Amino acid sequence: MAKTLARSTASRITKRLISTSGATTPSPSYILSRRSTPVFSHAVGFISSLNRFTTIRTRMDRSGGSYSPLKSGSNFSDRAPTEMAPLFPGCDYEHWLIVMDKPGGENATKQQMIDCYVQTLAKIIGSEEEAKKKIYNVSCERYFGFGCEIDEETSNKLEGLPGVLFILPDSYVDQENKDYGAELFVNGEIVQRPPERQRKIIELTTQRTNDKPKYHDKTRYVRRRENMR
């Protein structure tokens, strides 16, 4: 049943992306890198090469309104292992990677992209000042997106906002330093890492981009949601 449900969900996502972009499915081996690439190409490239995640968020039809993603509490340590098995170190469902398409529009500057990230998160939490506090990293080159610290229920509200492609549970790039990678973003400003840590982040990011995915099971997040009902 789970496999059938996963295949059905993946099919719906693929059809929606194709109808949105009108592009054919390529076979890229790199993370999002060019702003001119169609939406579907971005999506496939990101998923096929980013081995930090086992699944994209898939929205399930839930009748009856009884499902609550946070019914076991907001802290990872409070949740039963069967409900909240971590996929990777740092993957606590409190840190989310929001992947976007063409933030700020065509030919946007880096600052315009960052402003778009802040404005996008502000739409669901109330203010840009609060959004700046919640965003912990930004990416404007290897892929377009930002990391934010919000609970799972709040993360659900990002789906469907303009420019939002995927909502992914984030995980550490540098486990030793509990670092999620990309460019550090603190209170609305990019903060530079110490040179040694920055070199390590670059090495780890490059290595993970080139490695084949370690996990091929795309249904774990779906199964987790099913277990939490």
Curated annotation (Swiss-Prot):
Presequence range in chain numbering: 1-57
Instruction: Report the record's disulfide bonds.
Output: none
Q: Where in the cell is it found?
A: Mitochondrion; Plastid, Chloroplast
A GO cellular component term found in this entry reads: nucleus
Gene Ontology biological process terms in this record: cytidine to uridine editing; mitochondrial mRNA modification; mRNA processing
The reply on keyword Protein biosynthesis is no
Which InterPro entries does the UniProt entry name for this protein? Answer: MORF/ORRM1/DAG-like, MORF/ORRM1/DAG-like_MORF, S8pro/Inhibitor_I9_sf
Q: What happens when the gene is disrupted?
A: No visible phenotype under normal growth conditions.
Give the UniProt keywords, A-Z. Answer: Chloroplast, Mitochondrion, mRNA processing, Plastid, Transit peptide
Q: Name one Pfam family in it.
A: MORF_dom
Self-association and partners = Homodimer and heterodimers with MORF8/RIP1, MORF3/RIP3, MORF6/RIP6, MORF7/RIP7 and MORF9/RIP9.
- Entry function: Involved in organellar RNA editing. Required for the processing of few RNA editing sites in mitochondria.
Instruction: Give the record's family classification.
Output: Belongs to the MORF family.
Q: What is the official name of this protein in its record?
A: Multiple organellar RNA editing factor 5, chloroplastic/mitochondrial
Recall the taxonomic lineage recorded for the source organism.
Answer: Eukaryota, Viridiplantae, Streptophyta, Embryophyta, Tracheophyta
Q: State the gene name recorded for this protein.
A: MORF5
